[in-house]
């Protein structure tokens, strides 16, 4: 396709556009830089709309801890066994057969406490495989399966251990439990999210927070393009972070996209950023030079307006001396 005469524009912010031709050139440079890596971007046209999609690297720049969800939304929570199941013997026996519940009303306590002389309790087992209660143990009101349930509760089975491991998730290679209430990612560590060029800054923020199950509101954070010079440019709510990354260039040694607290970071313009790297003595010398230049400009303006004031006064005197004509 010949793009030489193409005039279609791609939005890159509120009332800001870039030609598709220029964006394709930036995209080509971007993909050449990440050739053979999963950070390469793809583009397509959908209903005459030019869409770029792929992974966006975002660096953590948080100073305060973030709150993590106590439970995973996708986790299946098994309810604890009810009190009736602990005393009914409804679990599987040792041979895999289900034992029927032994109900308390069938045990005749009066016969156990006062048996007639010479009579003995039958020693044979009933059809359920359970022996009747003996004379000297009237207080045991549980079945053998109940004992098994209690014993297994004190030991973690391999399935329980696997379930506990599934509670854990990774942030930049470090595993944390969902039940951990707060966490602060290492400053400068990198993560990524899969987005497209139609997603605005708030949408990207929500996607990133949902990825790591962070409870904090997206309103607390902002995305910044941070340059090695110290310049910090906040992405507006109407900006498209993926487009901004493409236009900044692929090299993260020059600029990175940071997630930061909205109320903790101030934007730094290019004019200010070019002085950040200097030492204090050098900066003081700059201030002195600027002060001297300011003084020279002030004196120049004072001389200029002094001359103008004298000229105006001289003209007023000339008008006053001239007789009025009728």
UniProtKB/Swiss-Prot annotation:
Residues 111-133 are annotated as: Disordered. It holds the Pfam family RA. One of its GO terms (molecular function) is protein kinase activity. It comes from the Eukaryota. Residues 272-319 form the SARAH domain. Keywords: Cell cycle, Centromere, Chromosome, Cytoplasm, Kinetochore, Nucleus, Phosphoprotein, Tumor suppressor. It comes from Homo sapiens (Human). Potential tumor suppressor. Acts as a KRAS-specific effector protein. May promote apoptosis and cell cycle arrest. Stabilizes STK3/MST2 by protecting it from proteasomal degradation. Interacts directly with activated KRAS in a GTP-dependent manner. Interacts (via SARAH domain) with STK3/MST2 and STK4/MST1. Its main location: nucleus. InterPro entries: RA_dom (IPR000159), RASSF1-6 (IPR033614), RASSF2_RA (IPR033618), SARAH_dom (IPR011524), Ubiquitin-like_domsf (IPR029071). GO terms for cellular component: cytoplasm; cytosol; Golgi apparatus; kinetochore; nucleoplasm; nucleus; plasma membrane; protein-containing complex. One of its GO terms (biological process) is negative regulation of peptidyl-serine phosphorylation. PANTHER family: RAS ASSOCIATION DOMAIN-CONTAINING PROTEIN 2, RASSF. The gene is RASSF2. Residues 176-264 form the Ras-associating domain. Phosphorylated by STK3/MST2 and STK4/MST1. Widely expressed with highest levels in brain, placenta, peripheral blood and lung. Frequently down-regulated in lung tumor cell lines. It is found in: Nucleus; Cytoplasm; Chromosome, Centromere, Kinetochore. This is Ras association domain-containing protein 2.
């Amino acid at each position: 396709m010949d793009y030489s005469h193409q005039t279609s524009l791609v939005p890159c912010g509120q009332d800001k556009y870039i030609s598709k031709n220029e964006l394709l050139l930036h995209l080509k440079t971007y993909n050449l830089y990440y050739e053979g890596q999963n950070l390469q971007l793809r583009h397509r046209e959908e209903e005459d709309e030019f869409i770029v999609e792929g992974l966006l690297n975002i660096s953590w720049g948080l100073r305060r801890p973030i709150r993590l969800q106590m439970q995973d939304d996708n986790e299946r929570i098994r309810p604890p066994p009810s009190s009736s199941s602990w005393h009914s013997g409804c679990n599987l026996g040792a041979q895999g057969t289900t034992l029927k519940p032994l109900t308390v009303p069938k045990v005749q306590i009066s016969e156990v406490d006062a048996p007639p002389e010479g009579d003995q309790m039958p020693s044979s087992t009933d059809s359920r495989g359970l022996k009747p209660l003996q004379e000297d143990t009237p207080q045991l009101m549980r079945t053998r399966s109940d004992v098994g349930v209690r014993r297994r509760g004190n030991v973690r089975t391999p399935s329980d251990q696997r379930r506990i491991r599934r509670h854990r998730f990774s942030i930049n290679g470090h595993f944390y439990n969902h039940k951990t209430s707060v966490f602060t990612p290492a400053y400068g560590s990198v993560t990524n999210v899969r987005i497209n060029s139609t997603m605005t800054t708030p949408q990207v923020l929500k996607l990133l927070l949902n990825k790591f199950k962070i409870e904090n509101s997206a309103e607390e954070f902002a995305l910044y393009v941070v340059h090695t010079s110290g310049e910090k440019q906040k992405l507006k709510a109407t900006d498209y972070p993926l487009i901004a990354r493409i236009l900044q260039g692929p090299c993260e040694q020059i600029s990175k996209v940071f997630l930061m607290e909205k109320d903790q970071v101030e934007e730094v313009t290019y004019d200010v950023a070019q002085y950040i790297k200097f030492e204090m003595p050098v900066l003081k010398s700059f201030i002195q030079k600027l002060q001297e230049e300011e003084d020279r400009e002030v004196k120049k303006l004072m001389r200029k307006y002094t001359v103008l004031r004298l000229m105006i006064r001289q003209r007023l005197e000339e008008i006053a001396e001239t007789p009025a004509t009728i």
